[in-house]
């Protein structure tokens, strides 16, 4: 049988990676350049840096001195969160589209595909069904954009959106991501070769090593080292930008896509086994597991759907470790969000379709992993210095913020621009 990504992550161990930085792909030229709604400053470069899986409490001067300094010298948003489901793909989609999953088509990492009759990862370019700031800045403002994304499935989902796209390489076996060292080196090369005006970056080490950290419930040895390593590499990026005269042009928007939670080996929920044991709903639901959340898609006759869903709520809601049950409409997930969503308590995880499907200790997707760091820094004169903002912000707010900086219309987005961070 084919290993799931979470099963594979559990067996990754220590991996040595070596090789070249990789290749950069060019998107097709923009067919038309529209006039921006306001002039775009010639000296503005925007970088959206996603520190994948970083928790708000890790943004401190001991673990992440560079990021903490950037935040202290810029504007920090103290009440920032992901959108549900708190996974990588839906929150990266939210960042660049500015709209909720029901509008962009990406409610989770994994969904139940009725056509295929199985669960699958949303890693195809046509899975993303909304415009992004990567393509809009390219086509409406006539400026170069770039994506430098460490994870293979992110590169797949955003294929063709940016003017310049780095294909992550070398990929670490099992994790399907490129280490932050290679990603930052690729970013520096992309800046040197193409001078993009807006760049979308994912740094995956904190997330990947956090997933596998067997000491996650206590010392977090691997996770803490990953935070330190990533932070140092971002210091290296800053020195590069300063030495090339680009720091004064830079607006740096830094945030995570979700947090991270750790569970003991036996604190797992296997909903598939409970469904199989119940004659009323056996074979009636497909499950897409997303670590801290499961989505359930109804497979039976239409006239029995309501009764089956009521029984599913009873069965799943009674399982130890289950926190909440949602109608997907409550979370604005859209049709791919299935017919029911279950989340787990902190310190638990889902493991479906079998108890062996998700052995990794670090997971996210559930409510406790919604909190994220979020700040705006950089050397550009428009960045407000030394401020904090306590109004709620979400990953959705990145796209309208970027759109506002480049003079693009954002009235139709669900997010709100983080204008408190700028002198505009």
Give a label for each model feature.
Residues 1-4:
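N-terminal secretory signal peptides
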Residues 7-28:
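N-terminal export signals
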Residues 23-44:
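C-terminal segment of N-terminal export signals and the immediately downstream linker at the start
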Residues 38-43, 56-141, 156-159:
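Active-site nucleophile/metal-coordination loop of metallo-enzymes that catalyze phosphate/sulfate
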Residues 41-42, 83-86, 124-129, 225-228, ...:
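A short beta-strand-to-alpha-helix junction
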Residues 43, 152-171, 185-236, 268:
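Active-site His/acidic residue clusters
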Residues 47-48, 66, 229-271, 341, ...:
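Metal-dependent active-site segment of extracytoplasmic phospho-/sulfohydrolases and closely related
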Residues 289-401:
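Active-site neighborhoods of enzymes that stabilize oxyanions during catalysis
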């Amino acid at each position: 049988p084919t290993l799931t990504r979470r099963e594979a992550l559990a067996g990754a161990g220590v991996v040595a990676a070596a090789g070249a930085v990789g290749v950069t792909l060019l998107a097709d030229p923009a067919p038309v350049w529209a006039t921006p709604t306001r002039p775009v400053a010639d000296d503005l470069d925007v970088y959206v840096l996603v520190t994948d899986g970083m928790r708000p409490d890790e943004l401190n001067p001991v673990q992440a001195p560079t990021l903490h300094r950037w935040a202290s010298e810029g504007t920090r948003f103290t009440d920032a969160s992901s959108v549900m489901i708190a996974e990588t793909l839906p929150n990266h989609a939210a960042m660049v589209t500015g709209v909720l999953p029901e509008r962009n088509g990406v409610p989770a990492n994994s969904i139940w595909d009725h056509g295929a009759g199985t669960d699958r990862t949303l890693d195809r370019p046509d899975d993303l069904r909304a415009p992004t700031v990567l393509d809009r800045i390219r086509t409406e403002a006539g400026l170069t954009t770039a994506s430098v994304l460490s994870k293979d499935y992110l590169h797949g989902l955003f294929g063709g959106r940016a003017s310049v796209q780095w294909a992550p390489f070398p990929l670490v076996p099992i994790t399907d991501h490129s280490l932050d060292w290679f990603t930052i080196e690729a970013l520096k090369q992309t800046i040197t070769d193409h001078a993009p005006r807006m760049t979308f970056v994912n740094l995956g080490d904190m997330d990947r090593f956090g997933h596998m950290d067997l000491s996650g419930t206590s010392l977090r040895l691997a996770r803490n080292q990953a935070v330190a390593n990533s932070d140092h590499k971002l210091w290296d990026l800053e020195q590069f930008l300063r030495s090339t005269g680009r720091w004064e042009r830079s607006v740096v928007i830094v945030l995570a896509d979700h947090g991270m939670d750790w569970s003991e080996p036996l604190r797992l929920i296997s909903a598939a086994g409970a469904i199989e044991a119940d004659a009323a709903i056996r074979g009636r639901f497909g499950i897409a597991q997303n670590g801290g959340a499961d989505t359930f898609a109804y497979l039976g006759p239409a006239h029995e759907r309501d009764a089956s869903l009521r029984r599913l709520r009873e069965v799943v809601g009674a399982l130890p470790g289950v926190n909440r049950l949602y109608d997907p409409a409550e979370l604005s997930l859209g049709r791919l969000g299935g017919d029911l969503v279950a989340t787990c308590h902190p310190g638990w995880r889902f493991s479906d379709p079998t108890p062996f499907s998700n052995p990794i200790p670090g997971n996210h997707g559930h409510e406790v992993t919604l909190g994220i760091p979020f700040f705006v820094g950089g050397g550009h004169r428009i960045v407000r210095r030394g401020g904090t903002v306590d109004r709620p912000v979400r990953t959705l707010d990145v796209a309208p913020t970027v759109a506002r900086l480049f003079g693009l219309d954002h009235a139709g987005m669900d997010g709100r621009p983080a204008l408190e961070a700028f002198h505009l």
